[in-house]
A protein has these predicted regions:
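N-terminal targeting/anchoring "stem" of glycan-biosynthesis enzymes
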Residues: 2-593
Length: 593
């Protein structure tokens, strides 16, 4: 029993000891847990401070890098960099950039909603030049032993105006006209006679009811007549001829009017204007060889394309030098053209900016190309170019050829053998260009010379075929600023500025008007349309206004080229002396064509 109690006490003691041990271990474990938690708290606080320190250091480094990037200059632009920049500009169309690549010229002319090759209004107008019942025929009014001789002046087309006006002057003076003499001594140095360029028989026969015309001056009782040589002022009207030339003609029987170009006023009575048209558009035709060769050139252009443009391009060194225009060629251009300009000792010092601002500078080949593209003509269009020597040669023509690769001339579509009968004579070569330009679907010019004016009038008379003359006064600023705008903006402005310069019917002629350019008296309208007087809106240029415009707005067609280098201006005053006893030099269109 005692042994059992003893064992029971030992068991109870053992249990108590294990319990105390567990309690002690629990305390130790709790303490270790508290210690671990405390250590974790300490470590978290330490880590936060480290991260704060690292963040502060990183922020300082970022600030330093930003300051460095702002204050350091940009790297030098390389060609590769600029090329990449331009490609970005092309994609985003950044208008503010001044780089040329912003001004992208399309290859297509676009769809402008109008017909490029004709006018939809032309069918309502037609040429009409028949004489009225009041117009006396030649057999009733021509006086016997009264002969008028004419010496023309300038290039082919300037001489053409003289021939046309000579017929009218003969009618005014009731005189017999002797076939006019062509100019063999001007800048062009062409020895061709009238019969070698124009059809004499047709000229005489078709005008037989209007004016008596002889090929040669007849002899006076077996002796040769001695004509009185005279010179009349520019724009001389009917009264001028009747009061100043007719008395001399009655006394001497034969009068020769020299330097006869633009010697007849634009303002004549309607029957005289219609006579001008009968001469120009029906009687004055080229010889058969010229017409046949011209027909061959036209057929070859038609074989290349259904429609084609004819461009009369005047950009000769002499003409540019005289005009005083500057085209950006630097000292080389100034030196070369300046040396040529010294031929004319009386020329004043040029102001290129003023000349161009007034619209007196011919457009460059590139500018003509840009204008045509803006008007809707794409790169697939074929162009026949009538031109002389182009200043700068192929380098000057390159931009135009890039815009219109289908670039032709009589030299490229005809052989040397075919052109041989004409190539030694500037007048006959000019006649070939005249024929092709006249038959083209669209005629374009970069100048306001004689050929441009003559053909503009002819194309109006025969159906108002499109004839594009650049509005140089407006376009010059546009060409200067073209790199500061998009192509669409440029093209829109070109089309706006060219309104009234496209050869459309009812165009109001801006500024002065040459009758040969706008033969309004010879253009009639179909029934149901307003009369020609009404369509002019009552605008009429008086004699005084005409004279003022001639003096205030001269161009190179009013310039006299003299072998001695002298130049003089003749005032267009109908009261100036008719005769020129001392042979003083006067105006002649050196830059006539």
């Amino acid at each position: 029993m005692l042994l059992m109690l003893k064992n029971l006490n030992q068991l109870i003691f053992s249990v108590r000891m294990k319990k105390k041990k567990r309690e002690r271990n629990s305390i130790l474990l709790q303490g270790s847990n508290d210690l671990f938690i405390g250590l974790n708290v300490i470590l978290c606080r330490k880590r936060h401070r480290v991260f704060s320190f690292i963040s502060a250091v990183s922020g300082c480094l970022l600030l330093l890098l930003f300051a460095f990037s702002v204050l350091t200059p940009p790297p030098t632009a390389t060609d590769h960099f600029l090329a990449h920049h331009f490609s970005v500009v092309r994609k985003t169309q950044v208008v503010e950039s001044n780089f040329d690549e912003v001004f992208q010229v399309p290859t297509s002319g676009g769809n402008l909603g109008r017909h490029l090759w004709s006018s939809n209004q032309s069918k309502f107008y037609y040429g009409c030049s028949n004489a009225s019942k009041r117009f006396q025929s030649a057999d009733l009014k021509t006086h016997p032993n009264r002969y008028l001789m004419i010496a023309t002046s300038g290039g082919l087309n300037q001489q053409r105006t003289g021939i046309i006006d000579a017929v009218v002057v003969a009618y005014i003076l009731n005189a017999t006209l002797v076939i006019p003499k062509l100019d063999h001594h001007s800048y062009w140095k062409d020895t061709s006679d009238f019969a070698e360029i124009f059809n004499v028989d047709l000229f005489i026969s078709s005008l037989s009811r209007d004016v008596e015309i002889l090929e040669e001056l007849p002899r006076n009782g077996g002796k040769a007549w001695v004509p009185r040589s005279m010179r009349v002022p520019r724009k001389c009207n009917s009264k001028c001829y009747q009061s100043r030339v007719l008395p001399v003609l009655n006394k001497r029987d034969v009068v020769e009017l020299t330097k006869f170009d633009y010697r007849l006023s634009n303002r004549l009575e309607t029957d005289l204007q219609k006579l001008r048209c009968r001469v120009n558009y029906h009687a004055l035709r080229f010889t058969d060889p010229i017409l046949e060769m011209g027909k061959i050139l036209i057929e070859r252009m038609r074989m290349k394309a259904k429609h084609f443009i004819a461009l009369h391009l005047r950009f000769e060194p002499d003409m540019l030098a005289f005009s005083g225009c500057y085209y950006g060629g630097g000292e080389k251009e100034r030196g070369e053209l300046g040396a040529i300009r010294k031929r004319w000792k009386t020329l004043h010092v040029s102001n290129p900016e003023k000349v161009r601002r007034h619209g007196r500078c011919p457009l460059t080949p590139e500018e003509i190309g840009l204008m045509l593209r803006a008007l809707g003509f794409g790169s697939d269009v074929h162009i026949y170019v009538a031109s002389g020597e182009v200043y700068g040669g192929e380098e000057t023509l390159a931009p135009l050829k890039a815009l219109f690769p289908n670039f032709h001339s009589k030299e490229t579509i005809a052989s040397k053998e075919e052109l041989a009968p004409f190539s030694a004579f500037s007048g006959r070569m000019a006649a070939l260009d005249y024929v092709v330009c006249d038959e083209s679907d669209v005629f374009v010019t970069n100048n306001n010379g004689n050929m441009a004016r003559i053909l503009a009038g002819r194309r109006r008379y025969f159906g108002h075929r499109p004839t594009i003359r650049p509005n140089t006064k407006k376009l010059y600023k546009l060409f200067l600023d073209r790199n500061n705008m998009t192509w669409d903006e440029f093209a829109s402005k070109v089309r706006t500025y060219q309104i009234g310069y496209m050869g459309e019917p009812k165009e109001v002629k801006p500024g002065r008007g040459e009758f040969h350019e706008n033969p309004d008296s010879c253009i009639c309208e179909t029934k149901g349309l307003e009369s020609s007087q009404e369509r002019n809106d009552g605008v009429e240029v008086s004699d005084e206004q005409e004279q003022q415009s001639l003096q205030s707005d001269p161009d190179w067609t009013d310039i006299d080229y003299l072998d001695t280098g002298g130049l003089s201006k003749e005032l267009p005053n109908a009261d100036s002396s008719v005769s020129n006893k001392h042979g003083q030099p006067e105006v002649e269109a050196f830059f006539s064509d």
